[in-house]
Amino acid sequence: MIKLEGITKSFGSLQVLKGIDLEINKGEIVSIVGPSGAGKTTLLQIMGTLDEPDAGTVAIDGTVVSRMKEKELSAFRNKNIGFVFQFHQLLPEFTALENVMIPAFIAGVSSKEANERAMEILAFMGLTDRASHKPNELSGGEKQRVAVARALINHPAVILADEPSGSLDTHNKEDLHQLFFDLRDRLGQTFVIVTHDEGLAKITDRTVHMVDGTIKKD
């Protein structure tokens, strides 16, 4: 599903990633852990085509995305990869439903179909009655579930999450973590999650440990 080979990345004189090789299978939920500065977020951004490696290749479902032109890459990203961040990044002027629909509009989906897709996902999240509410009317846990719904709207094969539960309380963290597994079981998606949450890392299918820009071998 996801294959990284020889990934390097430097910012100025600082080498952040030092020849990363990593394969992630379809339907896996993989956590990436390690100390701050280990290169976790940079690796996730390269995996999600938000940044380019200095060297090496990134392939998703057999497509070598690291060789794509920007326009082609943007379309591929919007269709095949969903992103969830620590802070929900919902647009405050739009309702929960409208926020979820935005990536579908970008992909050229009709308003009717986007609405149907969004309502179906919000229903699965238990948020049907919150669809018309704006972000400032939602709880922290609800906002993050809306952000997950937005990541799912185009039925991506891969969900990449960077500290998705970092701003949530214990109860909402547990609910969000369970949601990832429910989604995987229902939709067969692949999840890669950067986290400092030991509880989440323990229940994922596999944990990748990073230290100083490398993957630590067990």
From Swiss-Prot:
Its EC number(s): 7.6.2.-
**Please, one GO biological process term?**
transmembrane transport
Which InterPro entries does the annotation name? AAA+_ATPase (IPR003593), ABC_transporter-like_ATP-bd (IPR003439), ABC_transporter-like_CS (IPR017871), MacB-like_ATP-bd (IPR017911), P-loop_NTPase (IPR027417)
State the superkingdom: Bacteria
Q: Which Gene3D superfamilies match?
A: P-loop containing nucleotide triphosphate hydrolases
Where it sits in the cell: the answer is:
Cell inner membrane
Q: Does the record's keyword annotation contain Nucleotide-binding?
A: yes
Named from the GO MF annotations, one term is: ATP binding
Cysteine pairings via disulfide bonds: none
The protein's job, in short, is: Part of the ABC transporter complex LolCDE involved in the translocation of mature outer membrane-directed lipoproteins, from the inner membrane to the periplasmic chaperone, LolA. Responsible for the formation of the LolA-lipoprotein complex in an ATP-dependent manner.
> Which PANTHER family is this protein grouped with?
ABC TRANSPORTER ATP-BINDING PROTEIN MG467-RELATED (PTHR42798:SF2), LIPOPROTEIN-RELEASING SYSTEM ATP-BINDING PROTEIN LOLD (PTHR42798)
Q: Which family does it belong to?
A: Belongs to the ABC transporter superfamily. Lipoprotein translocase (TC 3.A.1.125) family.
By what name is this protein known?
Lipoprotein-releasing system ATP-binding protein LolD
Q: Which organism is it from?
A: Bacteroides thetaiotaomicron (strain ATCC 29148 / DSM 2079 / JCM 5827 / CCUG 10774 / NCTC 10582 / VPI-5482 / E50)
Task: List the top taxonomic levels of the source.
Answer: Bacteria, Pseudomonadati, Bacteroidota, Bacteroidia, Bacteroidales
